[in-house]
Amino acid sequence: MVYLKRPYFRKSRSCPLAQCPDEDIDYKNRALLSKFVSEYGRILPSRITSVSSRKQKLLARAVKRARFLALLPYC
């Protein structure tokens, strides 16, 4: 019996922050940052949120600053 591989089609998902300029990703914008942080306080990876690598770096930096200033919890 011959097993055939199923073709894998990856859905192309666009970055949810594509329309958002880089200045809007700010450590003071808690509403935006809380969308990309899990319920345990961890930063969600870009493979789950489908954020581009540039925006992911900006998000991570903003979340870390917000944590340091006690705007977001560490856990």
Swiss-Prot record:
Any one GO MF annotation of this record: small ribosomal subunit rRNA binding
**Which GO cellular component term is one of those annotated?**
cytosolic small ribosomal subunit
Q: Which InterPro entries match?
A: Ribosomal_bS18, Ribosomal_bS18_sf
Q: Does the keyword Membrane apply?
A: no
Provide this UniProt record's keywords sorted from A to Z. Ribonucleoprotein, Ribosomal protein, RNA-binding, rRNA-binding
**Gene3D superfamilies for the chain:** Ribosomal protein S18
What SUPFAM superfamilies does its record include?
Ribosomal protein S18
Which Pfam families does UniProt cross-reference here?
Answer: Ribosomal_S18
Nucleus: present as a keyword of the record? Answer: no
In the record, the note on similarity to other proteins reads: Belongs to the bacterial ribosomal protein bS18 family.
Q: What does this protein do?
A: Binds as a heterodimer with protein bS6 to the central domain of the 16S rRNA, where it helps stabilize the platform of the 30S subunit.
Q: What is this protein called?
A: Small ribosomal subunit protein bS18
| Taxonomic source organism | Anaplasma marginale (strain St. Maries)
